[in-house]
Amino acid sequence: MTTHGWGTRILLGAALAALTLLGGCNDADSGERNRLPGFVSGSVRTTAYDGTSDDLLTAGLGKTGLASTAPAFANPSRPTSAELRRLAIWSNYRALVDMSANGGYGRFWGPNVDLDGNATLGEGKIPGTEYLAYSDDGSGRKNVTLLVQVPASFDPKQPCIVTATSSGSRGVYGAISAAGEWGLKRGCAVAYNDKGGGNGAHELGSDTITLIDGTLANAVLAGNASLFTANVTSGDLAAFNGRFPNRYAFKHAHSQQNPEQDWGHATLQAVEFAYWALNEQFGPVLDSSHHGVRYHPGDITTIAASVSNGGGAALAAAEQDTRRWITAVVVGEPQVNVRMSPNAIVREGGQPAPSFGRPLADYATLANLLQPCAAASASLAGEPYLSGLPAATTQSIRTQRCATLAAAGLVSGADTQSQAADALAQLHAAGYLADSDLLQASMWDSQAIPAIAVTYANAYTRSRVTDNLCNFSFATTSAPTGTVASPAASPMPAIFGVGNGVPPTGGIDLVFNTGAGVDHRLATPDASFAGALCLRQLWTNGMLDMPANVDAVRVNANLQGKPAIIVQGRSDALVPVNHASRAYVAQNSISEGARSQLVFYEVTNGQHFDAFLPVAGFDTRFVPVHYYNVQALNLMWRHLKNGAALPPSQVIRTVPRGGTPGAAPALTSANLPPIATSPGANAITAGAGAIDVPL
């Protein structure tokens, strides 16, 4: 590996570029100089990886290392940027796929599995070059991280780009297994960005932040080089630290910029940055310091891809694209807030869905309020258990949440079971499918929904960390009481490598500020009901400009005639399919009408988190949606390159593995039927604002 520091750009492939000047796109280049896009702030860091000691896909760990324990730091208090990158790739790769051999890793997907689904690639290390930089508006506060990976197998005569916008609020490697891996194996450049969230953490007590490579610095000294610094005056910070010690600010929650409104824009910038990198690497040599422009907008086959929030960003980018940067779209389980027309409708089995097209601010705050109670329903017996708390504590939380909801008039029933049944019925009425019932507990117990409710409420109200919105904050705590306490060692040195940008993460917890502050699950017998109700009321009462900020993130479902594939699991309990993919397809049939080239594949027994599939009860009931994301990318590639028709929209009826929870039999192709060319009765239809999905 060769690493070049800040302020230096290496012109890799100059000799090759000179030799191939007459090949590929724009052969008769006029000598136009390749210029760094104006949104790039500061220098570009360029690093070459040999594919042996280090590489683009696995950071030198290979297929075996990714499946093993986390790579260690030589000095845990001062990890190097290379060590942090390795840990970030290890943790982000594992966060989005099932890493168990029985679940399919190493057989259906993984660095060793080629694009045809065969395990032919050994450890799967991929040599190539990375380009890393910030995008900013001149304020030094946006600092969206952009990263381009150019594999050594990139063919400048057949250029392609795949976007891999981070999922969730993850750092820049946050979609490496979801989209980056496929792109690298295809020989495409991969354009990553962190959407302006990027796992940016600010340790308020020590005034410590992370830089673009994850290394630490003092916030004041770092200045505009900081990934994120909370917008708090020194006086306010000192006062806050005095009252609320051991607290942390996070970029997605506390940047006061509502970054979601710019996710599409950031993805387009990532593509433009990739064009610059490819021109820099393969463009004609103009002189000893400059390359020319070989590729102009639209010259490179570009697939906007990713999952979850990254999928939503890809759709937004395709909608906003006015310069032909994007050729096609392939996304999984996209988190999108759709601007719905009054005449749009979602039907399943011929029956109208009770609710569809709600924004995340609505359904997440409702779920955060009701899920702990709904989870107590006897009808959900045998649901997977994803809490780190003792089962007795969890059951007590559920009972107490039901009782408090009933006392507040928010659920009906004289006992826990009737209250839980009503809570579950309310979730159904709000658009959650019965297919996701057994995941309601997991979404709250894993703290996914509480984390999302708090982070997005902060973002949508543009709150400062010092506001302690709804009395929640992020802090280190002590076990087993969950009380806020100073950590034995700061979580900051490793946060770039292990954090996901939405506490609880990386040793930083979500706390409710009772007394000194306590883990929100343990702060009160009903698990901080008052805070959950406050979050809900921000939406229902239209407080603190939340409706306007939510409106700013909505998409219009007009892909401008671009071919597109959406894949989502029917059992998704984090981003309900009625509010996301189904709503998007319905609205697309209005926004684009006959121009639409969008197809939608709904996967039965598929849910949001493939990384949960090794857990007992997940393994027996649910299948990997990632498998179908990869198939969709292959289908789109054949469509773009060979003119093959995309299979029509359909329900894919998978077969759960079954067996004993925690010991399900190995996944086989029998569990994963192919996407059908002629789906027959499984066809999904859309037109004039209506989507019809068969039961």
Curated annotation (Swiss-Prot):
UniProt EC number: 3.1.1.22
Catalytic activity reported: (3R)-hydroxybutanoate dimer + H2O = 2 (R)-3-hydroxybutanoate + H(+)
Record-level Gene Ontology MF annotations: hydroxybutyrate-dimer hydrolase activity
Enzyme class, first EC level, given as a word: hydrolase
One Pfam short name: 3HBOH
InterPro entries found in the cross-reference section: OHBut_olig_hydro_put
Keywords of this entry: Hydrolase, Secreted, Signal
BP term (GO), one: butyrate metabolic process
Pathway per the UniProt entry: Lipid metabolism; butanoate metabolism
Primary location group: secreted
One CC-aspect GO term: extracellular space
UniProt keyword Cell inner membrane, yes or no: no
Catalytic center residues: S308
Protein location: Secreted
Signal peptide: 1-17
Function: Participates in the degradation of poly-3-hydroxybutyrate (PHB). It works downstream of poly(3-hydroxybutyrate) depolymerase, hydrolyzing D(-)-3-hydroxybutyrate oligomers of various length (3HB-oligomers) into 3HB-monomers.
Assigned protein family: Belongs to the D-(-)-3-hydroxybutyrate oligomer hydrolase family.
Name by which UniProt lists this protein: D-(-)-3-hydroxybutyrate oligomer hydrolase
